[in-house]
Amino acid sequence: TNGAYDPTVAPLTDLWGIGTEHQQVPAQSDIDAALQTVGTQHVHVSGDSVQLDGGSRIDLGGIAKGYAADLCADILKDADADGLLVLGGNIYAVGTNEGKDWNIGIADPDEPTDTVAAVAVHDLSVVTSGDYERYFEQDGVRYHHILDPDTGYPIQNDLWGVSIICDSSLTGDALSTTCM
């Protein structure tokens, strides 16, 4: 992802507090200080051991639901069972729906109870990341939860959401976050 998905953004995530009762636009000096601890250069892997430089922390929120969905899908597959797993923006279609593909709707960011598209899938995951569910507004500016590890601010682009279809929900999570 060339750093676009960076699990070391935990200090920034905590600083912004988006989705919590403490959400705020942090002071630039606080963002600058947090950025000193962000980046995979602060992660050192040796065999089964992972060490972080001082102040660095890991936030697996960008892939945790995908990991959980994959584990649940494996349980269903091992039991030779069909089912639809829905974990927020992570949907895993295991097998078929009475012999037919599962029809998965992609939510409309402007009207989340409506859909903008539908895909027919089986044994695949459909993962959507977007800036339209976890955000706050301050002084007329909208701040969402997907943070840019280079700037320390929410990603700025013209996208409201990205959906990825693949055989791994964890991979879909990482890719959809990266593409945002």
Q: Predicted regions: what is each one?
A:
Residues 1-180:
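Mature catalytic core of soluble alpha/beta enzymes
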